[in-house]
Amino acid sequence: MGTLKRAAALLLALFAAAAFAAEGDGTLLPHSQKSFEAYAQDARAYVEANRRWVTEGALRAAELEANLPHEYMPEHPDGRAILLVHGLGDSPFTFDEIARDLAKEGILVRTVLLPGCGTKPADMMKVTQEDWRRTVEEQAGLLRARSKSFWIGGYSMGGDLAIDYAARHPGEVKGLVLFSPAAAVRSRLAALAVPASHVRDWITAPEERPNGGQNPLQYLITPTKGLAAFYRTMTAAQEGLEKLEKDRWRGRWFAALAARDGLVKTEALLPQFQRIAKGTRSAFLWYGTFPKGADAAGTRALPDAIGELKIAGFSHMALTYSERNPFYGKQGTVRFCWNGQGKAESLACEKGADVCFSGDGQQPEGAGGCAKLTWNPYYGEQLKAILSVMAEP
């Protein structure tokens, strides 16, 4: 979802005279498997054959595993199960820590790899909203058949797909677990993704970015057709929320939202979630100053400025990773240093300078240049809240 920050540039795409050539071969991850095991095997073969690799040597095995769907089988399963869906251009690794922790509590967890993801940005050229919806539909059906209590959740666009699924299958879903769901974005120009996709393939082409616009875990650029598919998915989630509210859906909710999310209009989503969840066993975490006039019932606000950790705000992507995460944690190997500060500060950050951390593109006055926060210092408290909502009577 990091590429959505470029939505404003879509206006320029409408007046482009020429399009960049697509680099993908148009093939997508196979579907319609009869078991999760077959799906996971096909995904492995597909990623191995089509991925543009970022790492080399021994690290490549970890890069591969991070981009594959996985099943996390509890030692003592209790009938609960949850399907977790990653965001636009992201990977199933988004949920690796959360999935392991939920499995320890008896919950069967599966992740998916959305079509167009896990290989290279150009493979988003022919992906559609229906491709993503079909993957969720198929994998939810397989997991639901293995469970007594079926849940679905997601991060960013994956949250949109989870909401859409719940709205279309309200009687089959026990509840939703959402992290920064992108059902309302801040950019007023997001709708231009659809017309822009007909006149230009890229805003920033892969050859213009290091590693072709990706890191080991996610894409850093997305073709306009992928952004158009995202917009349609967001619209479906908005319609799904309206349906759930109108039908007075009684499923449970957990949602984690950041006040300074630079991509999602979280202050608009929180009251809508609260209305739908009223009277159910649900919980919401709000990272930052509570919105003026918002209903605090069922919602816990946690400070997003933590001086001793040099944290000035939470970003869109920070919520699903703990500070121990080997890639995105406090001492992780991946840093997002180009976060709106000056070039010199960004370069110093890349060289390992001691920096502060903030929300998407946010640079507090006098902070000296903040990298984007990529981990959640409240990860443990967040996990407890999720387990409380998912607990069986």
Which residues make up each language-model segment?
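Bacterial N-terminal signal peptides
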Residues: 9-18
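Gly/Ala-rich beta-loop-alpha elbow adjacent to hydrolase catalytic centers
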Residues: 154-158, 162
